[in-house]
């Protein structure tokens, strides 16, 4: 079976943007991912797109977003106009989740059986604040709280920190909680909450600036969606949310023809990451580990025994998210283990 080769051409990102996709009532889906919708944008492999995305915070209550954010001291002129428009004009289908997704982007030549690489070239903040929202029934400890607990957190862009409190400042690590291709047609419309082989709500903090996300393609054009911006999040997203925020990512889309993967994969300047997805955390762990061993055998030429041993000695398993019905476990393989690695498009230790 063919696979994603680590010996691939290095395509350097340029400052040129080939397309822009705004978040408007006509270019977003609310709470679901669907297949074969009309394209919001069509591009070629290798092209770069700047996207606007919207956080769902402030849009899922019965009051409008201006009133929601006014309660936290945010003036009307700091509430995004496209968020107000989506709240007023877009209706969530029955049974849909909360996330607002921009797309779909069709990539020419992407066909079922290919792999779509999504390079995260840049992420900008659209607003200087985000929200962490939890409460009864949410997160890993659903019985911990007896009342809803929404916390607005200011973002200091100059210092690149989130001002959790006077004493606690959290370094920013922005990433898109949801990046997805359209799922197999047999699934029909799927909720945006549980992730799957198509990506989706993987909430994996390693998919920030300078990362590549690899997704299997199930439908012609790939049909890419993104949303659920996070300013920062810990492994697990344990209370059910990150600092949820509206972001503007710049992404490059590269189709790898004739390649095959079963689960989403990630590559950074320092690590290879495989993933396992399951409603059962133990099964997700087994899948992530098996994916890592398969990677080491195919990409690094190792025997199964050596790959298993190396995984026990130097590969870290972690819980990417534990709150979205389907759990995600990752296996992180440090590149420093290998004397030589193919050149990566994003240099290490880049500021």
Predicted regions and their residues:
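N-terminal, Lys/Arg-enriched amphipathic/low-complexity engagement segments
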Residues: 11-12, 18-94
